[in-house]
């Protein structure tokens, strides 16, 4: 299984995992490196919980050849938008896994997206591409969650409704050459599994966790985005991802906060977007949430079978700008990995 955490907008890796303390101040940034529990490895002093668990993480500092403009397609497909694309577009990796391996548990979708919609289109997931809608990620966020249980309808009545729907579909089957009805069939099967078993709904109900566990991850308001065109800062999405993996999902995607810190005022003109301000706000919350996820995976014996990948679409400029921010830098970036039975540290 894989949990992919997309840091919307591209995080400043040289202020997190690849500090340059001996460089001039306009390059070195606001932080000092701190030692970790891995000999010779240092990370940002604002990430103390990760530093204590660095033997459970791997930092890749050599990612390159990204496109310079924002586009989540890079993180979800491993491809840029340059060059010729197939009809329908490239599928994101969750859709590919869903196509090849299918569901691990009949009542839990194989690919689940916990990504919040972003008003800036390129920040959103690219979708199933040429694989078609049958391999889209299941999206349980929002008001539809209350519809994932049967309200006064027996399973017999539900089965009768499914049979009636199938008979109507058959009238159109021969005339359909687009593959759309194949997607409808997949959605119907998925919906039946969700409605006739409580496993998915229970996994999404975080009140089933103890208050102490929820506190370990930290809290956030999904209705409040730091920048309206990014994702909200909700570390409990990491907790939901872990619960969904336990419920049988193969792939869970999460988008987290907004990391496009060019300096000056943010997109709404209501907050200071300098790295000196935003990093002090974001780093501690991220540090707490991601380490809680990794601790949970190890404590529950999921670390061998569940890989966690954390990254953004590119790196940030080595030199701090006149606005006290870092701009886009596609030449090099980093990724953070954990679990998956990999050798870490």
Where do the language-model regions lie?
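Ligand-binding pockets and gating/stacking loops
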Residues: 1-345
């Amino acid at each position: 299984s894989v949990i992919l955490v997309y840091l919307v907008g591209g995080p400043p890796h040289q202020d997190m995992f690849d500090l340059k303390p001996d460089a001039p101040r306009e390059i070195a940034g606001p932080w000092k490196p701190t030692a970790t529990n891995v000999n010779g490895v240092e990370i940002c002093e604002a990430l103390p919980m990760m530093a204590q668990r660095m033997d459970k993480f791997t930092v890749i500092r050599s990612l390159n050849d990204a496109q310079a403009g924002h586009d989540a397609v890079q993180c979800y497909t491993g491809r840029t938008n340059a060059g010729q694309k197939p009809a329908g577009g490239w599928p994101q990796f969750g859709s590919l896994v869903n196509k090849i391996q299918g569901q691990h548990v009949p009542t839990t979708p194989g690919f689940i997206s916990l990504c919040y919609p972003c008003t800036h289109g390129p920040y959103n997931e690219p979708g199933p591409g040429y694989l078609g809608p049958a391999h889209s990620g299941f999206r349980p966020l929002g008001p539809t969650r209350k519809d994932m249980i049967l309200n006064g309808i027996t399973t017999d009545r539900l089965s009768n409704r499914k049979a009636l729907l199938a008979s109507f579909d058959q009238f159109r089957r021969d005339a359909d050459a687009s593959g759309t009805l194949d997607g409808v069939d997949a959605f119907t099967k998925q919906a039946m599994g969700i409605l006739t078993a409580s496993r998915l709904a229970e996994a999404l109900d975080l009140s089933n966790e103890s208050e102490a566990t929820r506190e370990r991850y930290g809290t956030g308001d999904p209705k409040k985005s730091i920048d309206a065109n990014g994702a909200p800062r909700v570390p409990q999405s990491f907790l939901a991802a872990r619960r969904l993996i336990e419920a049988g999902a193969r792939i869970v995607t999460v988008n987290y906060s907004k990391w496009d810190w060019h300096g000056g005022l943010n997109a709404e003109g209501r907050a200071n977007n300098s790295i000196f301000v935003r990093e002090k706000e974001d780093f501690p919350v991220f540090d707490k949430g991601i380490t809680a996820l990794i601790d949970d995976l190890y404590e529950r014996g999921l670390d061998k079978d569940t890989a966690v990948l954390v990254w953004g679409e590119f790196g940030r400029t080595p030199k701090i700008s006149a606005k006290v921010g870092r701009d886009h830098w596609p030449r090099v970036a980093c990724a953070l990995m954990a679990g998956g039975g990999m050798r870490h540290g």
